[in-house]
């Protein structure tokens, strides 16, 4: 059955069967009389706003006659006082809408169903996200409810040019996806490209929210590159700034993060804290972040290259040499330290909050001391790996941090096998990977360096003062 008919019993049987009435404990179905006519309503328990539903029932039940409404649309106009309601002819669309949280109402004598958007999803408060914290500025954050996230953006951009364009993705989850952009700022060609990629997504479910959508939009052609193709933020102020700059912010229901398109490599230099400090300090923080990017990737491979040959540390670089004896090969020590850092990260993620801080500190101290006492690691290896671990948290993207880790491991292995030639070869591989990586949409991944846009590159490296043209 694709469309509702004038047969009330047939319509109710079809909806009962498709919605799982009797099979699903949380599917509520109630019979009632409205104006002397039989009627039935369906709603998922936990989705419906009880106060709204109660008010509507208290209005419908006393009705004596609704014969003046010849169609469901006329019934809606005269007897449903709620704002968000529409008549639906399709059975499939009705079922999907109920699973999305709407209440369905069938009334005898009509060949359409009323869909009332009286949903109220379970939601947490808009507290500040655990990542991307700022010293000053707003301390709210996105949550798992799409409507609330859209309201956080609307509250900051009170402009009629702001468009929140709704889409549905996947066959099974039917996830709500919203594109947020400014009509007078967005690149229309880029916007059309995003729409086309969303329309072509052919997956049953996007249970992992943005990551599932990002992978579906990218396809399989870029699986070999470790660099992230999208930026994520849980901060409404950061998402607002991107929209104001002409970017597209993608919100997905059930996700507390916003996806920012287009994304280029140098976009990761920026962070929300830059704009809560004066321009000079913001510029310093960006330059510091770039230096940290380079050190994170190269400090351990370069140090390993220098200490492999004692002669290289005699020309004013004696402080880099290893004083203590060691039995485990230095390359194995560095790799072991890398894996221990990841082990501590994974363990802290799965540790209850009450114990996580103390566990991280004690775990690092105990493991580090044990490794030195057992002659597994020399103190210099621990010192450099501690710097790398701290530096990873100085940049705002977890994905980029793990990309640097994989490239750092590659450099260590190449240096161990080929000495300085391995370092040069590894640098060439990194440059080729960066040049070959393609963003989901937009210009090249290395924009604004390649293709060169001096003005855009300067804006990324230097935090300019706020002005009318630079907001």
Language-model segments: what does each one mean?
Residues 158, 199, 345, 372, ...:
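Short polybasic/polar patches that bind polyanions
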Residues 1-302, 306, 310-313, 319, ...:
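Membrane-embedded alpha-helical signal segments
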Residues 249-250, 257, 263-411:
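Transmembrane alpha-helical segments that form the functional core of multipass membrane systems
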Residues 379-381, 385-471:
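Hydrophobic alpha-helical transmembrane segments of membrane transport and translocation systems
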